[in-house]
Amino acid sequence: MRSVTSFNDSWVFSEASTRDAERSGRVSRSACRTNAVELPFNYFDERCYQRAFTYQRVLAWRPDFSQGSRSSSTRQWPMRSCISTAKRSSRIRDGYTPFEARLTDRLLEGDNLITVKIDGSENPEIPPFGAGIDYLTYAGIYRDVWLKVTDPVSIANIKIETRDVLSDHKAVSLRCDLSNPQGLSFSGTISALLKNAAGEVLAEVAGETTGQSLAFEMDGLRGLSLWDIDDPVLYVIEVELRTGQGFRLLRRAFRLPHGEFTTEGFRLNGRPLKIRGLNRHQSFPYVGLRMGRTAKGSAHADIMNAHRLHCNLVRTSHYPQSKWFLDHCDRIGLLVFARNPRLAAYRWGGMETGGNPERPPHRSSATGTTRLSYIWGVRINESQDSHDFYAETNRLARELDPTRQTGGVRYITDSEFLEDVYTMNDFILGNEELPGANRPGTALRPQQECTGLPRKVPYLITEFGGHMYPTKIYDQEQRQAEHVRRHLEVLNAAYARNPGISGAIGWCMFDYNTTRISAPATGSAITASWTCSASPKFAAYVYASQCDPSEEIVMKPVTFWARGDDDIGGVLPLIVLTNCDEIELKYGSLTKRVGPDRENFPHLPHPPVVIDHRHFTKDELGVWGMKWESAEFTGFIAGKPVADLRMAADPVPTTLQVEADSKTLRREGRDTVRLILRALDQAGNVLPFLNDAVDIEIHGPARLVGPARIVLQGGSGFLAGVHGRRRHASSRSRRRGSAAAKLDLVALADGAASA
């Protein structure tokens, strides 16, 4: 391989028609913006991006373009694009899977104008369109672009499979596919090294090739560690191709896990593991899908797993997601349920399911062959049955990777079961409120009621909650407490001593912009445990509190601590989401210590503490018109205090906090970091109903994403800046003063070789 370099920078953009761009020959820089459309936070017309746009960039001739090399532009998921140079063009009718546009023999000496024409309109022949969908498909080049210069014969792909991972002598199967578009005659050598994280060579194989793919076996491997959620050990396969025309080196990280869904639940490396996860959309305020590597990669994965939510699985909704996010999931020990892009017409039964082998499920499956998640979604989300089509998607997935189980997400009962795992969106909780409902509130239905099968099968809940009880971060306290209780009830049912359920994946992680067929008035779905501006709702702590205290001690009272927020008045019953043994509440001169509510939530690893009139009488906490006091909460483990929290009776704005997801940004390409603003009271708690405006300033060679003045929602706000050499962001509110965050640029160059 000669080089793979970032091709993200120096693009100019035009809202002019593609015909106008071709006529002018080049888009004027003074007339362009970085984004096709910058969306308001809410209340916007989704049709604003459903039209044609043009991106252009000059590629200067380089000597290595002519030395028998092949040049191509690799794009990760632009929405339905046509790429052209002065000589020819390439076309892709898919917004979700990566592709290469070959530039070999198209480049001229001198400056070459690369034109990318984006069609953001909804075409029913292109997934996911065809009927209604409940998310937005933002137009534009919203992920990374690479310029790849290779030898005429190069490595096209590495496919890695692991075998016998539970034995002392493990095995790795490797297939190396070659790219030789000119059909050149050659002979060469392919060698492969297996290395650990320290770079030590653990195994080596080699073979001769005259153009065909080569398969290798590395067996009898001793001393290799299994990848685990608590110990995510990664290994590297390094493949080198040497021919008379040169050589190419390709590296691919992989892991050695053993995950299996059984009728007795999910087992990871031979031990039972109850899945606790959330679905994740990858959109952001203002820019949709167009965020840099740090923001859409490590930041989201860390929230899911390591720092905030302590989930062990993420389900990608409803499309293939950023390579950077998936790579980081591997690094931090987060399981992934991979998805195909949803073709809405299949859900509503409005499209024939006959077979073009290059339809998107094929492309998505092929893209994921080296992504060692434990289950593939080979069924279009919540679609009707289609025997021939889904028999083919299952066959294809098993052919591409026989080591991985398949799953098919449905919401209909008694559905044809063609996959290895029956995956079900169970939204039964809340149906008791519908007219004519004749069953009481039910957290989850028994497996066989949903499958209609006479036997138990591997079974996983892939969605629950969500639209059944939409909740805003600034909703009244009792609604938020009910939101919390519903998540608790479903997780409690999933953890019940019923091994037939492998676990449950809630809907969803972040609020997101969606279409009007399912959106609330603002246009943003409020169905998540976090806001779209990355602020946790109370329900987020349902998941966080289930972690072991050795990972993090969690104590979150589900209250704004005010007498007048709840109906009738007061704060009881008061849920405290915690993994502590006991919670002590001090109110005035009174102190009460309460343990977990195992009566109502007997199966959770860490049931919540529920403080009610069994612990405080009406007179002890006072009634309307009596003095309202501040509260102090203390968490105890093994009789020792481990957490404390004070909630003020008279909260006032005191501090404006600025927190960055990362203190570093990458130099190469386009990177973005999220900054979260929070208005805090004198006790350090967020002021949930403060909606003041905050002014933002960015100092240095960086750019603010979104408006320079934001209004706090739920006591918090969101902004993001695209990187420069060094940046300093500050914010100011007239009532609360100012706060600042400083970010420095660092040179972190990794991942390019796998583009």
From Swiss-Prot:
The organism of origin for this protein: Rhizobium meliloti (Ensifer meliloti)
Catalytic function, reaction form: Hydrolysis of terminal non-reducing beta-D-galactose residues in beta-D-galactosides
Gene Ontology annotations of biological process type: carbohydrate metabolic process
Entry-linked InterPro entries: Beta-gal/glucu_dom_sf (IPR036156), Galactose-bd-like_sf (IPR008979), GH2_Domain-Containing (IPR051913), Glyco_hydro2_dom5 (IPR040605), Glyco_hydro_2_cat (IPR006103), Glyco_hydro_2_CS (IPR023230), Glyco_hydro_2_Ig-like (IPR006102), Glycoside_hydrolase_SF (IPR017853)
Gene assigned in the entry: lacZ
Any GO molecular function: beta-galactosidase activity
Family named by the database record: Belongs to the glycosyl hydrolase 2 family.
Domain of life: Bacteria
Taxonomic lineage of the native organism: Bacteria, Pseudomonadati, Pseudomonadota, Alphaproteobacteria, Hyphomicrobiales
Protein name: Beta-galactosidase
EC number: 3.2.1.23
Catalytic residues in the record: E382 (proton donor), E463 (nucleophile)
Keywords, alphabetical: Glycosidase, Hydrolase
